[in-house]
Every structure is written in C-alpha cells, then in structure tokens.
Amino acid sequence: MHHFSNIKDVVAIDFIKAYAEHLKKSGKLEIPEWVDTVKTGMCKELAPLNPDWIYIRAAAIARKVYLNNGIGVMALRRAYGDQYNKHYNPSHRTLGSGKVNRYILQQLEKMGIVAKIQSGRSLTKEGRKDMDKIAFQVYKEHEAKVTPMILMPMN
C-alpha cells in the first residue's frame, strides 16, 4: 500500500477542488470587483462561467508554486494561455492574463501562503503545511473510496 508523503500523491483536480473550497471558507482571499467581467486571456471571448473560478485558479496557482519553486507571472501566463483563432488566420498560441495571475499571487502573499523571492514566488512554511494538510485529507478520502473495492472477496 502506498503511503502519503506530499501533494504529488493526490490527483491534481481533486486537490485543487478541495483547496479552492478551503480558500473560500477561509474568507481571506479578497474578491475584486472585476471578477465577473474579466477575461482570463486574450484568447477567451467571455469571462469564466463558474462563479467560484477565482478560488479554483488560486488553488491551481498555489499548487503550481508548490511544485515549481520560483515560478513567476510570465510562466503562469504561459501555463494558462491558449490557442487564439480568428477563423481566417492560422491559430496562434497566446498568453493568459497577467493581471489575474499577478493579483492571485499578491493575494496568496497577503495570506502568507507564498513569498516573493528573486526568481519569482516560493511557498512559505505555513503555506506548505496548509497545502499538505489539505492534500492528506484528499488522500484519506480517496483511500476510503478505493480500499473497500480492493478488499471485496472475489466469487
């Protein structure tokens, strides 16, 4: 049986959902007035439809900082970019929104989850502990769902 050691041991989407819920419940993430109207990149035509999209993006960015120490806004813009297609021209790769990613990093800094370093952003000890705690909860929930299936007798 595999033992939990860190965030890499859980499925990314499950962790992001759980951590987004944790950020929402904490109430520390300030929601800007432009959250309902902003596009997340030049390639997008509309603002995100999910009302909790900013919590999900914040959780995903926090996970990226956890996995990539020293990540910056430009790397996040590349990660959240997409194909831009004007229908009559060949599509091109575009960058995601710098403002959205920068704002979320600044909010995570205010919350004490990430800190600025020379090469970008890094996770704080408190941020790592907090994320590992949520990841462990996700791991336990997943283990509880999977274990009974393994132990069932075969007929």
From Swiss-Prot:
Cell compartment(s), UniProt: Cytoplasm
Record-level GO BP terms: ribosomal small subunit assembly; translation
A GO cellular component entry from the record: cytosolic small ribosomal subunit
Organism superkingdom: Eukaryota
Pfam families linked to this entry: Ribosomal_S19e
Main location: cytoplasm
Key words of the record: Cytoplasm, Ribonucleoprotein, Ribosomal protein
PROSITE patterns attached to this UniProt entry: RIBOSOMAL_S19E
Gene3D superfamilies: Winged helix-like DNA-binding domain superfamily/Winged helix DNA-binding domain
GO MF, any single term: structural constituent of ribosome
Family per record: Belongs to the eukaryotic ribosomal protein eS19 family.
Record note on quaternary structure: Component of the small ribosomal subunit.
Function: Component of the small ribosomal subunit. The ribosome is a large ribonucleoprotein complex responsible for the synthesis of proteins in the cell. Required for proper maturation of the small (40S) ribosomal subunit.
Descriptive protein name: Small ribosomal subunit protein eS19
Native species: Entamoeba histolytica (strain ATCC 30459 / HM-1:IMSS / ABRM)
